Amino acid sequence: MAKGEATRQLILDISLDLFSKNGFAGTSVRHIAREVGIRESGIYNYFTSKTEIFKEIANKFKSTAVGSTIISDDLVEQLEEPHQFLNNFTNKLISHWNSQNERRFIRLLLMEQYSQSSEKIMTLNEYMNEARSMWWMIFDELTRHKLIKEVDPKLLSDEFIAPLYMIRIEYMAADEDGKLDEVLDKAYNHVDFFYDSIKID
């Protein structure tokens, strides 16, 4: 990575950290520059404003496809064993959410939902829509092949993913990751309960 690209990425990473702690309104360009280790004027060599930094962070997470990050050919091959598939997908999803930047972003997203700032990073509903779309397709596939009970895939999608997001919000919106085992236990318990309600007896 060229020096300029590395500095630009460092500005984004530092800004995400500061925004997630102080909010958009509580973070200044001066503070960002100080943490990056450059003059305040140096920020403007890469971004026109704090708002542009904020929007670029949001766009990065909007465009980061969770599905393409998590779903592999090996995982898709497990669809014929729905319980195993759901468990393994959940493990990969929690691991993805456990990265430092994912933790910071969900905290920032929650902080900015009801802020008085004119800049809105995105709504929780917008953030969850990609996961919903992916799960609609997965449950539609499982239903069509009679691997689970015949239930509206959109309903199944919401019923499956919403508790996982609640677990994420409760346990994974802090910087530390010391509760990962507890998070996984709760997630697996949800998968077991959910699968019991959709499996074909």
Task: Describe the function of each predicted region.
Residues 66, 84, 99, 104, ...:
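Amphipathic alpha-helical packing segments from all-alpha helical-bundle domains
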Residues 1-6, 201:
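N-terminal intrinsically disordered/low-complexity leader segments
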Residues 121, 125, 140-192:
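Hydrophobic/aromatic-rich alpha-helical bundle segments in the mid-to-C-terminal region
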